[in-house]
Amino acid sequence: MFELVERANTTNIGVELDASHLFWQQMDPVAVVRHLRELVVHAAAKDVRVNPTAAIQGVLDNRFRRLDQSEPRVNLGGNEWANAWPVDAAWDFVAVGRGHDAQYWAEFLSALYEVDPKMMVNIEHEDTSLGPIEGLELAASVLKEAAQLAGIAIDELPG
């Protein structure tokens, strides 16, 4: 990211840091926030659970199955379609708190707070085992607990 900013010779490039994509790559989102510092301008709270299958398939599990045109599919735009996720995937997107506990998320929020005390964090919910409201409620509850553990007041939203 630093190289991109340097080559572009600009100061208006920033990172929307999505912890989930770092988790499945076995990266530490807290360390990444502290490394990128002021380049992080927004964050997404989405969790990942690495499953035992990762020991055999690795995190680059490529057992996704292309859906046949006769199967119900989700169009991603143009001629791009979502594939079928492996039944026993190496990792899964899960609601915040189902992959990493509130203490971990407290560290994540603290790192973001060090960069910008008014940093906005949005919840991304892709846990297919939970309904849309249930997943958001769980994530919000874990993040509120994490903020409390980190000593970050969330009583007022900026702006």
Predicted regions and their residues:
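Histidine-acidic metal/acid-base catalytic patches
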Residues: 1-17, 21-159
